[in-house]
Structures are given as C-alpha cells and as structure tokens.
C-alpha cells in the first residue's frame, strides 16, 4: 500500500472527483467530514482512521481494511463493502442503506441505530455486533453470522435471514414481522417481546430459545409459522 504524509493527503483530497485511491494507506488519518463519495478505495487501509461524518456514498471499498475506524454518522449509502474488514469499527448511526457487504467481516462492530435497510449482507460475519435499534428492514442476511449479537429493538421487517446464525443473539423487542428465518439457527436466542407476525420459521432451530411470551422453547414441530 502507498503511505502518504498529511500534506499529501490534504493535497489529494482537494483534487477533482472521483478520486482513484486503490490500495492507499490512510490508516490513523484524520478524515472527519471528508467527501470521498464515489471514490475508488478498493483494498485501501483505513484502519483506525477518523471518518466521523464522512461522505462515502457510492464508494468502492471492496476488501478495504476499516477495522477499528470511527465512522460515526458517516454516509455509506450504496457503498460497495464486499469482503471489507469492519472488525471493531464504530458505525454508530451510520447510513448503509442499499450498501453491499457480501462476505464482509464486522466482528464486534458497533452498528447501534445504523441504517442497513435493503443492504446486502450475505454471509457477512457480524459475530458479537451491537445492532440495537438498527434498521435492517428488507436487508438480505442470508447465511450471515449474527451469533451473540445485540439486536434489541432492531427493525428486521421483511428481512431475509435464511440460514443465518443467530445463536445466543438478543432479539428482545425486535420487529421480525414477515422476516424469512427459514433454516436459521436461533439456539439460545432471546426473543422476549419480539414480533414474529407472519415470520417464516420453517426448519429453524429454536432449542433453548426464550420465546416472545417469555417461555422457553421446548417443542420441535416440523414447521413453525410465526403468529
């Protein structure tokens, strides 16, 4: 990766857009409020960078390293984050609407109150994430790993969670209306107060789960329809 001085970064960011920043090293850089919309940042090193309130809408961040970066209230609408590393990243209140995060790694990331509506998160590793009050409505989470994650009060309306790993996830008071949970693993998950109206739980594993009414799941029928 190409490492840059503070002056070089300042000079570069004031050039005509969109910028070509593939494989650039901006780790630890102070980039708050910066406009990097539509920029090419594939495989860039942005680890520990300060990107609070940054505009990264439509940016190409494929396989970029954003681990432990700060992206508070950043705009990442329509951004391409496929295979990106977002481990332990602060994504509080970030806008990831319609963004792509296929095979992304976001272990222990903070996505509290984030907008992930219609985002594509297929096979994303979001183990132990904070997603309380996040908007995941209509998101594609097929095969995603959300084990141990905090999804309390989250909006998962019409989300596709087919084959998702939700073991020990806290889904208390979450909206799972019309969600597709086919073949999902909800073992030991907490569903207290969750709304499962019209949710599809066919083939889902619920052993040890705490159900919306506070009871522990015991029966194992062949097919379950939320209601």
Positions of predicted regions on the chain:
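Tandem repeat scaffolds
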Residues: 3-227
């Amino acid at each position: 990766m190409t490492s840059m001085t503070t002056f070089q970064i300042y000079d570069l960011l004031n050039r005509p857009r969109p910028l070509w920043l593939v494989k650039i090293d901006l780790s630890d850089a102070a980039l708050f409020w910066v406009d990097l919309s539509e920029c090419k940042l594939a495989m860039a090193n942005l680890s520990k960078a300060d990107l609070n309130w940054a505009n990264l809408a439509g940016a190409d961040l494929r396989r970029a390293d954003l681990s432990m970066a700060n992206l508070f209230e950043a705009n990442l609408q329509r951004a391409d984050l496929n295979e990106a590393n977002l481990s332990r990243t602060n994504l509080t209140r970030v806008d990831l609407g319609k963004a792509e995060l296929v095979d992304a790694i976001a272990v222990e990331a903070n996505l509290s109150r984030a907008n992930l509506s219609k985002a594509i998160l297929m096979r994303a590793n979001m183990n132990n994430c904070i997603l309380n009050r996040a908007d995941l409505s209509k998101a594609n989470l097929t095969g995603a790993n959300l084990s141990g994650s905090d999804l309390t009060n989250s909006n998962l309306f019409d989300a596709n969670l087919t084959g998702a790993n939700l073991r020990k996830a806290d889904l208390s008071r979450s909206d799972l209306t019309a969600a597709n949970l086919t073949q999902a693993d909800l073992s030991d998950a907490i569903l207290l107060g969750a709304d499962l109206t019209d949710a599809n739980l066919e083939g889902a594993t619920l052993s040890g789960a705490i159900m919306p009414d506070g009871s522990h799941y015991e029966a194992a029928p062949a097919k379950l329809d939320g209601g």
